[in-house]
Amino acid sequence: MSTAAVQDARKQAEALDNEDSIAFVRDEFNIPTKAQIASSRLADSHPAALPASEDDAKCIYLCGNSLGVQPKRTVTRLNQYLTTWATQGVQGHFKPLEESPLPTWLDADAKAAELIAPVVGANVSEVAVMQTLTANIHLLMSAFYRPDINGRHKIILENKAFPSDHFAVETQIRHHSLSTEKSMVLIESSSKDNIISTEEVLSVISAHADTTALLLLPGIQYYTGQLLDIPAITAFAHKHGIFVIWDLAHAVGNVPLYLHDWGVDAAAWCSYKYLNGGPGCIGGLFVHTNNSVVTKEITDEKPEEGYNNRLAGWWGNDKKTRFVMANKFHPVAGAAGFQLSNPSILDITSLSASLEIFQEAGGMEALRSKSLKLTSFLEATLGHMKEEDRAHFRIITPSKSEERGAQLSLMLSDGLLDTVMKELEARGVIVDERKPNVIRVAPAPLYNTFKDCVLFVEAFSAALEVAKQHAL
């Protein structure tokens, strides 16, 4: 960028940051310093808050699409949980403690469901905090994928699906003694940037409508950052009698979702990206009310009737009879009836600490409002780079704001990625790479600033210059 362009971008960023009505929540997070990310030693103690004058010492962290940063209150909440365990032992399951903000362990998952429901646009009864993403996808498919080789047996997914989704589909098909050659349909993109148009999705559905049992798609595509038209695709699939599951790993906490109103059948997500739950933290699933009702009183004589069959565990059993130990499964109505084992309270406590901040920030609509501005500003600032630098990358994420979340994916010219990533890290910038040529940059509205976007573009410009010289 030219000196004038840099100065202008910094002035714009300062003005936008001053206007940011949710800027206060940035202080709720531990953003690593440049010194910390450069160090190979474990810090002696938990990172302390930096004085405002030292904000420049923080790294430029634009990697919330891979792993969100740590909320400061996570340590407080985890210590409260550990203190409960240390001082109460097994009583922590049932005994509420005065002056503790934490629910009893028996109720921890239900409280977390209350916190996550507005994030995904669901009734509380339609969500469960449980397991991990791929495990939940398997659980949903085990309940709702009932193939008939003489009728509906196919599963449709995108050809560039995240590998774990692909593996789940393949193994579910084989589990039913079917072949992927006959029962798996891949949606191919005609775009050089792997963008899947809604028309392409609908065309594939139409072509296989009578033989398709299930559709599995990402709410936001992990590689390109494309936001798919969830309500339109869901409605079209339903017209053809197809059950729809959405993988919301990159959508939850990123864009507003209205799963109940959209009539989504089921969905699953992780919690360590935009939800900031921590590495490998507990996942979640959504099952629409229409698919999770207990239609009549379950009797001991016919315990398999009255609800949709699923792989079951005792934590999905009605709380009234859960501890009777009668070995007769009476599921909770709603998504909670799909739970298996008692969940990790450590995980739920960590996730809930972050979800508290979502509430304080005003919910997903407020975050989306800022996110739209952040990502558009980042895109515009990249457009002000020198022409000779812009010739070495292109943005493959859709340019329309309604077709993307926070992430911009930058496709670099061949041979530049490794050097660019090394140079960015040396300049205190953390982003995500996807071989062979893509950098994924995701300003998260909870803790990123417009200034972060400018500083990234400055560092990216310098990194490109070095990479081009190395490539000669």
Curated annotation (Swiss-Prot):
Enzyme Commission number(s) from the entry: 3.7.1.3
Catalytically driven reaction(s): L-kynurenine + H2O = anthranilate + L-alanine + H(+); 3-hydroxy-L-kynurenine + H2O = 3-hydroxyanthranilate + L-alanine + H(+)
A molecular function GO annotation: pyridoxal phosphate binding
Keyword Amino-acid biosynthesis included in the entry's annotation: no
Primary residence: cytoplasm
Places the protein is found: Cytoplasm
Keyword Cytoplasm: yes
Domain of life: Eukaryota
Binding-site positions, pyridoxal 5'-phosphate: 133-134, 162-165, 247, 250, 272, 314, 342
Gene Ontology biological process: 'de novo' NAD biosynthetic process from L-tryptophan; anthranilate metabolic process; L-kynurenine catabolic process; L-tryptophan catabolic process to kynurenine; quinolinate biosynthetic process
Pathway: Amino-acid degradation; L-kynurenine degradation; L-alanine and anthranilate from L-kynurenine: step 1/1; Cofactor biosynthesis; NAD(+) biosynthesis; quinolinate from L-kynurenine: step 2/3
PANTHER family registered for this protein in UniProt: KYNURENINASE
Function of the molecule: Catalyzes the cleavage of L-kynurenine (L-Kyn) and L-3-hydroxykynurenine (L-3OHKyn) into anthranilic acid (AA) and 3-hydroxyanthranilic acid (3-OHAA), respectively.
Record's protein name: Kynureninase 2
Organism: Neurospora crassa (strain ATCC 24698 / 74-OR23-1A / CBS 708.71 / DSM 1257 / FGSC 987)
